[in-house]
């Protein structure tokens, strides 16, 4: 006896076949309801907005008061920031300072540009407030105090930081392939680290994803920096992470010691970022007299040139950089001086 299907049942069968539902369809089998993915309502998003506004723990501050204030307290998950500047102007210095200030966040720092020893030594120098060369020389001599401090910092305040250089990245990819994972390129490896590995190691996904720097994402299918930045941004957002991408501005003839604008990221995916910072070293401005350049030797310039938060406030600020590589926030220095003055009264 032939079982007749209603129009709705027939349409359901067709839909199941289209989505590749497993198993043969029997005429006698009742039509199964088709699963339809849900989408958030405006009320759902509004509830998250309210929670976001009242929760100060869900923001990743950079440690520069005026910029963090313009960002509403810092960067949030699913947001992407590009840090742009010419070669050797301090792009990584800014991020190192931010990481050193945020020990409670899981940070996956992928650095095909610099070896992990170099990155960690600079972070430790800031944490220990010592010149990187002094830290290295003391460790070389076997100074027990510095060795103890290095190990203590690394297993406590830096326990949530993972630094993955090119060698570690390649070894991880090979291990994935041996385990049967399909690895088509570096994005697949980074995706596994941000999700599967982080959840296994920490019980949750990474809070912050740093890639240093964009042009060293070696994937033949990503032919230029905008394509690379787009892929990295998509990856970070997919894992609900704060995404920070370092981008080296053109090696053109522009003044290395002058403030850079958003055009410094031209053709570098600046239109893809929610926020963009540019950095420079004022003492490299060749138009300044020699004595002025000498005075600016330890000055670090930073500007928030793209800001999609609130009213889009832009910020430009000069900061002092210490021998340890620490950036001194003028706002914090003013507060400290004010408190000292109050104590003297």
PLM regions: where:
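Conserved Walker B catalytic segment
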Residues: 222-234
